């Protein structure tokens, strides 16, 4: 159960910031109607699945062969595999969004550090300084006039008094350069577009996986679990009858998981509709146009440079004939 709790927390982290309302409803369906039911109810229902699968024969290996024929993969294992695969696109989106947020944070910190980076004050006791203090007097004056930058504002320390404060020292606020603001806003917009595009891609992949597992479940098990299964697989000598434990309960469970998968498919389609098919098409076309423009720029014919001809003379040409 601890592994499922970790998966639930990761999915909640993916939904809190970037998902739509439909995505949050989908998370509730996945967490409550899939993870909790499979982890709590499924283990008790399918705990004795193979041991209680009994055939009316004493032929060694016949029970195992017929069980493998009836259930190529156990219901509970199939649903666990389905949950893991369906949640994989969301986990990939978490990794991508966290990586982009970390890059944006590092870029912001580097910009702030560059803005706050200043040279140390020059010594006050140079050759043109007042009376014989030399470098020692300059250092003492520097200590008195030490300044601190707090929240982008140049301020005096407590050791500095009004008598020692020079007239040229002013309190100034660091204002960002307009070009830096444009660059930061452009990079933030590009990051948001990348996250939105990746979110749409993971919704599409998640829906494709849901449909694939739904079709696979139908072809493997159908809509019911029979109580009596007839088998003539080797090493059974003749056709034998095998009995499945709790067939009605497993049928209800199977239909319930069909319904949950269908609801997830509908919610994924509704989320894509909410995001806007037109926006999705424009995003895809924009990415294709960008790649095409880069390709055209790379393959653009460069201006031909005339190169002097250092070919062979008439006599040398005739020598090679």
From Swiss-Prot:
Question: Where does the sequence pass through the membrane?
Answer: 20-42, 76-98, 198-220, 253-275
Kindly report every residue range on the membrane side named Extracellular. Answer: 43-75, 221-252
Where is the protein found, in the record's own terms?
Answer: Cell membrane; Cell junction, Gap junction
Q: Which residues lie on this side of the membrane: Cytoplasmic?
A: 1-19, 99-197, 276-321
Recorded topology in the membrane = Multi-pass membrane protein
Assembly, per entry: A connexon is composed of a hexamer of connexins.
Its recorded name reads Gap junction delta-2 protein
């Amino acid at each position: 159960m601890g592994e499922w709790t970790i998966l639930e927390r990761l999915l909640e982290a993916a939904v809190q910031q970037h998902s739509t309302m439909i995505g949050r409803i989908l998370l509730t369906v996945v967490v409550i109607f899939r993870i909790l039911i499979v982890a709590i109810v499924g283990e008790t229902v399918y705990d004795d699945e193979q041991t209680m699968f009994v055939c009316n024969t004493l032929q060694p290996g016949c029970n195992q062969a017929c069980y493998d024929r009836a259930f190529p993969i156990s219901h509970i294992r199939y649903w666990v595999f389905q949950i893991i695969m369906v949640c994989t696109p969301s986990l990939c989106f978490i990794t991508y969004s966290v990586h982009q947020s970390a890059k944006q944070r590092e870029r912001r910190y580097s910009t702030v550090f560059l803005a706050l980076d200043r040279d140390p004050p020059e010594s006050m006791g140079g050759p043109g300084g007042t009376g014989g203090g030399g470098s020692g007097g300059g250092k003492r004056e520097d200590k008195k006039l030490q300044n601190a930058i707090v929240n982008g504002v140049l301020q005096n320390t407590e050791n500095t008094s009004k008598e020692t404060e020079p007239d040229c020292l002013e309190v100034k606020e660091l204002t960002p350069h307009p070009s830096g603001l444009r660059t930061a806003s452009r990079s933030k917009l590009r990051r948001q577009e990348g996250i939105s595009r990746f979110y749409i891609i993971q919704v599409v992949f998640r829906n494709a996986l849901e449909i694939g597992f739904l079709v696979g479940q139908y072809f493997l098990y159908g809509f019911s679990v029979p109580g009596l299964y007839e088998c003539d697989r080797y090493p059974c000598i003749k056709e034998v009858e095998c009995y499945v434990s709790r067939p009605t309960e497993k049928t209800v469970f199977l239909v319930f998981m069909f319904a949950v998968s269908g609801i997830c498919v509908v919610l994924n389609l509704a989320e894509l509709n909410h995001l806007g098919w037109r926006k999705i098409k424009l995003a895809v076309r924009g990415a294709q146009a960008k790649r095409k423009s880069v390709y055209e720029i790379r393959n653009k014919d460069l201006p031909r440079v005339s190169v002097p001809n250092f070919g062979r003379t008439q006599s040398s040409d005739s020598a090679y004939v």
